[in-house]
Amino acid sequence: MKNLVYFLVCILIISCKNEVKKTDALGVVEFQVTGNNEAQASFEKGLLLLHSFEYDDAREAFLEAQKKDPNMAMAYWGEAMTYNHTIWGEQDYDAGFLAVEKISHFQDSDLYSPVEQGLIGAVIVLYTPKTAKLERDVAYKNYMKSLYKTYPENQEIAAFYAISLLGSVPEGRDDAIYGQGAEIAKKVLEKNPNHPGALHYLIHSYDDPYHAALAIDAANSYSKVAPDASHALHMPSHIYVALGMWDEVINSNIDSYQASLNRMKRKELDNNARGYHAYHWLEYGYLQIGEFEKAKQMVLDMESYAKETPSDRTNMYLAFLKGTYLVESNQWDSSIADMDIDVSNLHLTAQAQYYFIEGYEAFVEKNAEKIETLIEILSAEIDKESLLVENISDGFTVCSSLSRSAPTQSNIDQSLIMLNQLKALNGWLENDVLNTENLLKETILQEQNLSYSYGPPVIQKPTSELYADWLITQKRYSEAIYQYTATLERATNRRLALEGIEKATKLSVQGKMEI
């Protein structure tokens, strides 16, 4: 009998252990909301996923919570929050507004805590009708600030206030505001080091070469805290790229991309569920350590994914991977250079990247006529975008949904830099020394005014690096070294800049020996 009892206890222990293994590893939140226990579990899963920007899966969990308890107000709040992608500049306004309509009657009910009512009020502000997106973002931030002052110990209010600060910056980075977000996230982590949102938002707050070291602990922790969120596995590489830690960049994005494949298989999804963002960063990591063949195969695989499941998204990432590979490998005679990609439906910056790559290939082939044609095409696209941005600033759009293809001043500024790079390449090809140098110097100044571009650079060939390459052809080696070194200020341990310094130094020594 004792043996039977012992056997049953062992089975029970093993069963419990197996159950623990099946639990999603998404981090830890301490937030009890009004609703039954079954719905609470679904809500908590949705909240954890929301903090890791796994918006589709978070929405699925929140909708599940609504079914389990139709009176759980916070489940509707969560659904509405999944339609607003703060850092990504995306919002499905119509879907979010419909979710808010389901939630509004809960706001003043005595059934819900003041914290719940406060968060419901905040999301209603986020989807205020007939109000421009930036105004809503700022109003939401201010609302969250007031909640934070009232409930400074509430970790969820603190976390969402931190991310609202980042979301209130219309374009690029604002170090002062991002610093505020970081300080709030750090306070949450002091109490709960496994909070996925605080870890995530701290990384975003310090995501540039000048601050990245301040988030290295968060980067090292986040993927361990929330390994079942693909984005949590990718996010540490933001800090690793900023610090030039290429092995870590590679490992992070191998894990993140594999997690997306696991999810794709589990949910029986098509290629659009692949983590192309992590895939692109992985390619960039390989190229920084000279793994050209691995990177090339990735571009070829991306081409096959785009053919199997054609979409604007796959075309965009194919263009990204093509451009990154060619710039970083300098293998312009590769078959990759001959890939034709339809970029007509992509946002302006993606089009400009593609036209720059086509122009650089024409430069290598000494085809000035093609460069001039590309300059005309890109100039026309910039003019169109400028008109759209002007209309938006004049109030022609208010509550329409936003996506990354929406016209922005940042897109124009980035594209003007690539346009000037094309003009400089044309001048270089025509041996117009004065015009080429003036264009490159002017463009460097323009690029310095841009916010830091995390990850694979948006300006795929940094202008200071391009200028340094040109200076070498003019035998101005010390100036070239200076420009390559300047490139490293925003691109830590960038391989081409480091190799450029080495090359210019050797040529300089040889030149002195010949004298």
What are these regions, as identified by a protein language model?
Residues 72-73, 154-156, 195-196, 229, ...:
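Residue-level recognition of tetratricopeptide repeat
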Residues 42, 76, 83, 118, ...:
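TPR repeat positional signature
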Residues 67-68, 108, 148-150, 189-191, ...:
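Solenoid-like repeat scaffolds
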